């Protein structure tokens, strides 16, 4: 799986979030390294700033999940 830095992953998440009216106000996505057993994603997000509405959070989770399977967090 291709690797990206935390800044690159955040930029990709923000690019996708900017396309939806419920999430376009988000300016920061905190990227957190995980240490999975097996082949799961090695990162997740921890915070959205500013926090969107409940509907926006659900949409953001879906959009960010689409990034999990495409890139791993670089060492």
Question: What is each of the regions a protein language model found here?
Answer:
Residues 1-28:
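N-terminal acidic leader/helix
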Residues 18, 33-75:
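Detector for the mature cores of small, proteolytically processed
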């Amino acid at each position: 799986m291709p690797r990206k830095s935390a800044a690159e992953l955040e930029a990709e998440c923000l690019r996708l979030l900017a396309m939806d009216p419920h999430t376009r106000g988000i300016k920061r996505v905190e990227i957190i390294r995980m240490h999975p057993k097996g082949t799961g994603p090695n990162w997740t997000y921890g915070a959205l700033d500013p926090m969107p509405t409940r509907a926006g959070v659900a949409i953001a989770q879906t959009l960010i999940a689409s990034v999990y399977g495409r890139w791993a967090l670089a060492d």
